[in-house]
Regions:
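Conserved anion/nucleotide-ligand pocket segment
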Residues: 109-121
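Alpha-helix boundary/capping and short turn/kink residues
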Residues: 45, 49, 77, 117-119, ...
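Core alpha/beta nucleotide-donor-binding catalytic domains of modification enzymes
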Residues: 1-110
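Short, structured loop/turn "capping" segments at alpha-beta junctions
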Residues: 90-93, 119-124, 138
């Protein structure tokens, strides 16, 4: 995927510059429409709950001491274009954004079609927020499972798991084990 490789390269260049200049916070211009495109792309890939809600406002960049922040996630693209035109009198157009060879462009166009069918921004945002709430509930039960049903022996560097550790839903067990790894 050319766009994914280009994005990874951009992130890497930005992260390297941040590291050179001791910058701890990198603000990106992702907006609400980007969030929805990403959500649908993840559905097409068959992502689980974590994948569907992975586009968060604040994340660490690959374990480094760099915080990636997306302060514009609540704004629609049309609002940002309006602000750009009114305040800066211009905005940069990326020709790949209209190139149908790219999945993201096709998904973006699908979103326009779905909007005509009644899937508006408010409903998509509500769906994503509901999924985030579900994820928070799962995290709560994962933490509870780890606290009640796991002991870490430092001297031997091993985990002891009780029988009850596995007496949970598949997702709780999976995420609990993932946290231990």
């Amino acid at each position: 995927n050319i766009q994914a490789k280009a994005r990874d390269k951009r992130y890497s260049l930005l992260a390297n510059e941040c590291q050179k200049n001791n910058i701890k916070y990198l603000l990106l211009g992702h907006h609400l429409n980007d969030l929805f495109e990403n959500f649908l792309i993840r559905i097409v890939r068959g992502s689980g709950l974590n994948g569907l809600i992975s586009f968060s406002k604040n994340t660490k960049y690959r374990g480094q001491d760099l915080n990636i922040m997306r302060p514009l996630l609540n704004l629609e693209k049309k609002d940002l274009l309006y602000i750009s035109n009114e305040v800066f009198s211009f905005f940069v157009k990326d020709p790949s954004n209209i190139n149908e060879d790219y999945k993201r462009t096709r998904i973006r166009n699908l979103l326009y079609s779905l909007e005509k069918e009644g899937l508006d921004i408010k409903k998509l945002k509500l769906t994503i927020n509901n999924l985030k709430d579900s994820d928070e509930s799962i995290k709560f039960y994962v933490d509870k499972n780890l606290k009640k049903n796991m002991v870490f022996l430092k001297k031997k560097n091993i985990y002891i798991l009780s029988y009850n550790f596995f007496d949970q839903s598949h997702e709780i067990i999976f995420r609990s084990l993932t946290k231990l790894i």
